[in-house]
């Protein structure tokens, strides 16, 4: 039986661990490294599928937990699965809901069977197990789905993380057995282990032995420093087979994307570009710009003079500032379009730099222009 997801390595950068490749899915082939915009509720906030396609997005992420709670996976399935339900014809990846259960849910109780918790919307008692998570994802119908895992806090004790990793491996095996559609949906295993190298190695060894079509690196970008995250990536990406995609979950600041690629990561997702857009914060080729600041009231230039997105081709900082200040939804639509375009096209430039074997030089120039080399620089 052919797997639903296949990875093809095209080239490795001569000076780093960066990989140029492509992932073949039932809804098209997309190049890697890639950034995936997040559509938590089956929509990337403030953006239409047509706008996403126009700016070059090839795959988006949706959230299993939120769609299970509302409207329910049965309704999405009845609507033809996520692709048809939201009218998106390209790739979709769903997480397993585990991260939300462990970060949002109140009064949770973790057992070997799964997690009992209260729904944060109405207080109802709910239960999510590896089998239930896979059933929901099968019904939602994404191209790529995640195993149910526990995401322990980065600074949790060694003993706690050890038990958590062992349980996550057992849950991964149960999820693999429960998976009904391996020929149309690729299931990834999630490597955990917080900052402990031996536990990350154990987690990777367990999951690689199960031969998933791809592997995610979880439990990062949860409050640890950039140096800590890069330290963990330095050894973790090497544990994943070369012929499988490597996905770093929940990472989306420009510096972290480039530094992740340098260490061999292929896929990234984050709510960052749309979340910061809603308060008027924009990523530009010259660094972070808060368009609602008073100094832009009479600035009739685009957000970024080097950007070809719909927003920068058509609207000025002064106009967008006016929209944000008056709480007009069109303003946050314009900033969202710009930020998502910025990250999608940053990855396009990164892919070209790998092709040209000059990713380190690209990083140096980008960091200088963006302002990462200044003291007290923001990370987005």
From Swiss-Prot:
EC number assigned by the record: 2.4.2.29
Cofactors required: Zn(2+)
A cellular component annotation (GO) from this entry: cytosol
Known catalytic reactions: 7-aminomethyl-7-carbaguanine + guanosine(34) in tRNA = 7-aminomethyl-7-carbaguanosine(34) in tRNA + guanine
Record keywords: Glycosyltransferase, Metal-binding, Queuosine biosynthesis, Transferase, tRNA processing, Zinc
Keyword Zinc: yes
Region of interest (RNA binding), residue spans: 250-256, 274-278
Gene Ontology terms for molecular function: metal ion binding; tRNA-guanosine(34) queuine transglycosylase activity
Signal peptide: none
Active site: 95, 269
Note accompanying the cofactor annotation: Binds 1 zinc ion per subunit.
Leading EC class: transferase
HAMAP family cross-referenced by the UniProt entry: Q_tRNA_Tgt
Family to which the UniProt record says this protein belongs: Belongs to the queuine tRNA-ribosyltransferase family.
NCBIfam families, per database record: Q_tRNA_tgt, tgt_general
Protein name per its UniProtKB record: Queuine tRNA-ribosyltransferase
Organism for this UniProt entry: Pediococcus pentosaceus (strain ATCC 25745 / CCUG 21536 / LMG 10740 / 183-1w)
Gene name of the encoded protein: tgt
């Amino acid at each position: 039986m052919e797997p639903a997801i296949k990875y093809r390595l095209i080239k490795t950068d001569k000076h780093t661990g960066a990989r140029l490749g492509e992932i073949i899915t039932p809804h098209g082939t997309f190049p890697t490294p890639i950034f995936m915009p997040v559509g938590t509720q089956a929509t990337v906030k403030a953006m239409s599928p047509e706008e996403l396609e126009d700016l070059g997005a090839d795959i988006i992420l949706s959230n299993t937990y939120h769609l299970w709670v509302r409207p329910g996976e049965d309704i999405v399935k009845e609507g033809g699965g996520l692709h048809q339900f939201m009218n998106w014809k390209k790739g979709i990846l769903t997480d397993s809901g585990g991260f939300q259960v462990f970060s949002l849910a109140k009064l949770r109780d973790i057992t070997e069977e799964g997690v009992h918790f209260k729904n944060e919307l109405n207080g109802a008692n709910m239960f999510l197990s590896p089998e239930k998570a896979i059933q929901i994802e099968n019904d939602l119908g994404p191209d790529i789905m995640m195993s149910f895992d526990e995401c322990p806090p980065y600074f949790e004790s060694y003993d706690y993380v050890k038990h958590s990793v062992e349980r996550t491996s057992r849950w991964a095996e149960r999820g693999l057995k429960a998976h009904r559609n391996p020929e149309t949906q690729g299931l990834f295993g999630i490597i955990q282990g917080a900052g402990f190298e031996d536990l990350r190695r154990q987690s990777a060894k367990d999951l690689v032995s199960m031969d998933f079509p791809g592997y995610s690196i979880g439990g990062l970008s949860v409050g640890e420093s950039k140096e800590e995250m890069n330290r963990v990536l330095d050894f973790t990406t090497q544990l994943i087979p070369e012929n499988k995609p490597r996905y770093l979950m929940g990472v989306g600041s420009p510096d972290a994307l480039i530094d992740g690629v340098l260490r061999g990561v292929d896929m990234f997702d984050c709510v960052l570009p749309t979340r910061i857009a809603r308060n008027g914060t924009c990523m530009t080729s010259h660094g972070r710009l808060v368009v609602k600041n008073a100094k832009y009231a009479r600035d009739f230039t685009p957000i970024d003079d080097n950007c070809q997105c719909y927003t920068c081709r058509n609207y000025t900082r002064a106009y967008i500032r006016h929209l944000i200040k008056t709480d007009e939804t069109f303003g946050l639509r314009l900033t969202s379009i710009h930020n998502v375009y910025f990250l999608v096209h940053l990855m396009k430039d990164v892919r070209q730099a790998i092709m040209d074997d000059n990713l380190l030089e690209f990083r140096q120039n980008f960091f200088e222009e963006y302002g990462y080399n200044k003291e007290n620089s923001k990370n987005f």
